């Protein structure tokens, strides 16, 4: 597990490097599906002092199997998403400013241009609010459930992120680094959408044919963006 712990540590350290977190407001995890184990950031540990060996290993029930610290308080959310979507290899949660602003506003992040379409096939969705019962009960587990309720049976890697109402963004990917990459893009397109709609409140969504072209040339079966 040392290799995965190092990967998760590096991905977590990317959060402050890319300006996605303030203090300890974020966490990254990754899963080893063969072993049924998840590596995640420890709860409340400062990035300045954190080391790879501080990463916590839990099983799919959330039981700590390796590590001296308690795992992230959002662990149950991560585990619920891993259980539901086998294509996910890494998950990240932050309170990055612009994506969180859309979450607090209770609005999807609209697909307005090609930067968005290169990564997200359509609007970045938002969840409903959790009920008082859901919050007072198994809050973090129910956060995962409301994300799943919103995504349904869609392929999560086609829209690798969501904003949880009144909370903040979650993003995911094929591994921990891919998840952070998508979280960075999510923050950038959230900022772009806010600025664009401020300039032109009547701005329409990106044309569907342009969205299809940009997404499929990068992610489709005949993708030709980048190198093999």
Swiss-Prot record:
PANTHER family: FUCULOSE PHOSPHATE ALDOLASE, L-RIBULOSE-5-PHOSPHATE 4-EPIMERASE ULAF. It catalyses: L-ribulose 5-phosphate = D-xylulose 5-phosphate. Binds 1 zinc ion per subunit. HAMAP family: UlaF (MF_01952). Belongs to the aldolase class II family. AraD/FucA subfamily. Its cofactor is Zn(2+). This is L-ribulose-5-phosphate 4-epimerase UlaF. Catalyzes the isomerization of L-ribulose 5-phosphate to D-xylulose 5-phosphate. Is involved in the anaerobic L-ascorbate utilization. One of its GO terms (cellular component) is cytosol. Keywords: Carbohydrate metabolism, Isomerase, Metal-binding, Zinc. Its EC number is 5.1.3.4. Pathway: Cofactor degradation; L-ascorbate degradation; D-xylulose 5-phosphate from L-ascorbate: step 4/4. InterPro entries: Aldolase_class_II_sugar_metab (IPR050197), Aldolase_II/adducin_N (IPR001303), Aldolase_II/adducin_N_sf (IPR036409), UlaF (IPR023499). It is an enzyme of class 5 (isomerase). The keyword Methyltransferase does not apply. One of its GO terms (biological process) is L-ascorbic acid catabolic process. One of its GO terms (molecular function) is zinc ion binding. Substrate binds at residues 26-27, 43-44, 72-73.
């Amino acid at each position: 597990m040392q290799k995965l712990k190092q990967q998760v540590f590096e991905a977590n350290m990317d959060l402050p490097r890319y300006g996605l977190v303030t203090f300890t407001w974020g966490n990254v995890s990754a899963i080893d599906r063969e072993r049924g184990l998840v590596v995640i950031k420890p709860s409340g540990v400062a990035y300045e002092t954190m080391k790879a060996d501080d990463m916590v290993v839990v099983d799919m029930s959330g039981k700590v199997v390796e590590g001296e610290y308690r795992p992230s308080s959002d662990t149950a959310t991560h585990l619920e998403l891993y259980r539901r979507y086998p294509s996910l290899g890494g998950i990240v949660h932050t309170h990055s400013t612009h994506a969180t602003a859309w979450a607090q506003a209770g609005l999807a992040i609209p697909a307005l241009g090609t930067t968005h379409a290169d990564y997200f096939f359509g609007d970045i969705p938002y969840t409903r609010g959790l009920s008082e019962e859901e919050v007072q009960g198994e809050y973090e587990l129910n956060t995962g459930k409301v994300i799943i309720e919103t995504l349904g049976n869609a392929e999560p890697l086609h829209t690798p992120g969501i904003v949880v109402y009144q909370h903040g963004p979650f993003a995911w990917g094929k591994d921990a680094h891919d998840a952070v990459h998508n979280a960075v893009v999510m923050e950038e397109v959230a900022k772009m959408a806010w600025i664009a709609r401020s300039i032109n409140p009547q701005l329409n969504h990106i044309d569907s044919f342009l969205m299809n072209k940009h997404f499929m040339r990068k992610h489709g079966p005949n993708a030709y963006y980048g190198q093999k």
